[in-house]
Amino acid sequence: ALRAEWCRGTLPPGQLGWRKAKDILEQAAALAREALPLRTEAARAVDVDVELGAGRRLTGTVSPIFGNRLVWTTYSKLDGKHLLPAWIPLLALNAFAPEGDWSAVCIGRPKRGAQPRTRRLGRPDTAAVDLLRDLVAIYDLGRREPLPLPLKTSYAYAEARIGGKDP
């Protein structure tokens, strides 16, 4: 993989490019090491079909699921836009099969440092189907006009509130 990246020609020339490629490889390996213990069970898929009301349904397949856990890994620095691809399927699982002990783990690079950042998502405090309805309403609104609060700003505000800081 390292040689392929080098041959692709996207890295700086000489030793600088080689060092950069090795740094990228080390960071990717750290992410893989963090995710591997969470993926020990065989991956499976769950077909969901959730009635949202007003003639709308959410249907699809959530995968891969390891035990009762979604594991989402990204090379990007973990942020709000990386949590949504795990959170929305987690809501779908909780709405479709509320008796399940569903969870999700999101792994990505940290904002600072080298240790991978991990966020665990569990059962929502609010009924999952209600949250899915809210997301559909936001989707509908976004198809008509700009959304009132951008994702990065919303995530920063929520993190500050949860962390007890002044947003």
Regions found by a protein language model. Name each.
Residues 1-167:
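Structural signature of nuclease core domains in nucleic-acid processing machines
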